[in-house]
């Protein structure tokens, strides 16, 4: 199993960091929205914006990848995602957060597309199931671990948003 993991170790580490940041942001926004006094209905709309963006991003991924390539697409979408996380602290209103969630969802689904296409392209057919099972363990483990990052500071502070953007 180790010979299978070593060549993709850096990519799996990148996935772990990406999902730590995304998982942290998802929970952080729900808590911070409550602290800001947003209604449950507003929070429902805000959080659903991620999935609207996720859907939109599926249509944007291929044209962007074809136009600028996998590496530039990855860098571009990682930068957009990081900026959108940080902007949540500056645009503290439900409409702003909804729009930022759409941007975040689009960016992340394009990042997942690039990552999974790299894994798919690297892996021989007979090993693909093993590689993607490792990928899913990293994926879900990172999302679970991300919740513990909330212990590092108050949700009302900038620190957790900065950490989410860094990851």
Annotate each predicted stretch with a short phrase.
Residues 51-59, 143-144:
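Residue-level signature of mid-helix packing/kink "hotspots" within the transmembrane helices
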Residues 72-87, 165:
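Structural signature of the two symmetry-related core transmembrane helices
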Residues 2-51:
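Helix-loop boundary and gating motifs at the non-cytosolic
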Residues 22, 103-115:
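Core transmembrane helices of Major Facilitator Superfamily
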Residues 57-70, 150, 154:
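Helix-to-loop junctions at the C-terminal end of transmembrane segments
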Residues 69, 90-95:
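Helix-breaking motifs and short loop linkers at transmembrane-helix boundaries and internal kinks
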Residues 95-103:
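Paired small-residue
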Residues 29, 110-123:
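Intracellular juxtamembrane helix-capping segments at the cytosolic ends
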């Amino acid at each position: 199993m180790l010979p299978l993991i070593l060549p993709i170790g850096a990519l799996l580490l990148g996935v772990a960091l990406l999902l730590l940041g995304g998982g942290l942001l998802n929970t952080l926004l729900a808590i911070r929205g409550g602290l800001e006094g947003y209604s449950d209905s507003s929070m429902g709309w805000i959080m659903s914006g991620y999935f609207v963006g996720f859907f939109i991003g599926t249509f944007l991924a291929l044209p962007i990848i074809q136009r600028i390539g996998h590496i530039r697409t990855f860098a571009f979408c990682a930068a957009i995602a990081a900026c959108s996380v940080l902007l949540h602290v500056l645009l503290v209103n439900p409409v702003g957060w909804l729009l930022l969630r759409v941007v975040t969802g689009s960016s992340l689904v394009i990042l997942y597309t690039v990552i999974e296409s790299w894994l798919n392209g690297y892996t021989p057919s007979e090993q693909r199931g093993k590689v993607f099972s490792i990928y899913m363990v990293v994926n879900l483990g990172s999302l679970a671990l991300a919740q513990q990052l909330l212990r590092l500071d108050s949700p009302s502070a900038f620190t957790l948003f900065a950490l989410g953007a860094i990851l």
